[in-house]
Amino acid sequence: MNYNEAVEKLKTFNQEHVLRFYEELNEDGKKELLSQIERTDFTVIEQAAEGGKRGKIAPIKAMTLPEIEMGREHFGRIGIEAVRAGKVGAVLLAGGMGTRLGSDAPKGMYDIGISRHVYIFQRVIENLMKVVSKSGNYIQLFVMTSEKNHDATVNFFREHDYFGYDSEYIAFFMQDMAPAADYGGKVYMEAKDCIATSPNGNGGWFLSMKKSGLMELIEKRGIEWLNVFAVDNVLQSIADPVFIGAVLEGGYSVGSKVIRKVSPDEKVGVMCTEDGRPSIVEYIELTDDMLTQKDENGEYAYNFGVILNYLFKVDRLLGLLERKLPYHKSAKKIPYINEKGESVKPDEPNGYKYEQFILDMIQMLDSCL
């Protein structure tokens, strides 16, 4: 994109101020800013809804532990066959940094070992290898990174020889970024040559995969299901044959792993139905009545906490791309440079960040285990 093309695009969205410092930049800075303008989707600002009225929320049934144990052998056999046939891929959402862990590195690089080095990425691979060993077939792993941690993540895997995993079955892709804007819809500038952006939420992973050209690899491998999971949980089973088998056996469009809450007020989102379709209600949205509501067995009705571990059918995901997921905006503190080019770090929220949520993906599908 050249300068004139950038001006025209910015005029379309009333964002001409992005080029305010253009003449002060060196050639590299000008090139990078024009490139960012070209790839930035300014339409998200107009698309986004704040909160929005939820539909009718109701409890959802889940497969209980006794039911799982009863069908474990049968479900496990179905799941292993699907893995062995190459029909299952895994998607690791690893775009975050380890800031809350006291680290400036990608979260997956954090060392959780006590007597020896054990990295979060290492545990993910070790968990996945359990199923690989059982099935005799490598599972294609897609690792989602972000602009801030992509190079560090890729290099970390290389330096550790992919923790023993076949590198041909690991593909990296970057999460899309969304512009951050003030309350009037004007995007902030992080620097004179850089628009302020943030990751586009946990619902944007599949679109980011598509934009990265990974659909060809999915087709080549014959992958029909994708197990999506977050980097945070080092104890979770990945590509769990029993989970896969139960979803396939029931003919569901998506499966969600859940855990019973330790108490009604535990701060975790829960699976539910919304207007009769599967959905998720965040803990801040749960009313006192919902927190204390019980089912016919005397159990808490909204009791199935989500852990961000889902199994999606690929062909249904492709259908979602045609419908487009909504964007949601939330007020945040966004560092920026002012009209004088001075850096400002606000003490209070000063604008919106824009995200797509995985709950919208689930709600667009008709059935969930």
Regions found by a protein language model. Give the residues of each.
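Active-site-adjacent bridging/hinge elements
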Residues: 91-103, 182, 287-290, 329-336
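N-terminal glycine-rich phosphate-binding loop and ensuing alpha1 helix
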Residues: 3-171, 179, 189-206, 214-215, ...
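Fold-independent oxyanion-binding glycine-rich loops
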Residues: 95, 146-147, 175-176, 211-212, ...
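Flexible loop/turn segments at secondary-structure boundaries
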Residues: 97-101, 109, 143-144, 148-152, ...
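Catalytic core of tubulin tyrosine ligase-like
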Residues: 222-227, 235-239, 244-369
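Beta-sheet entry/capping signal
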Residues: 87-91, 108, 138-143, 169-171, ...
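Conserved structured core elements
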Residues: 84, 91, 103, 115-122, ...
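Conserved beta-loop-beta/alpha segment of the NTase-like Rossmann-fold superfamily
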Residues: 162, 167-266
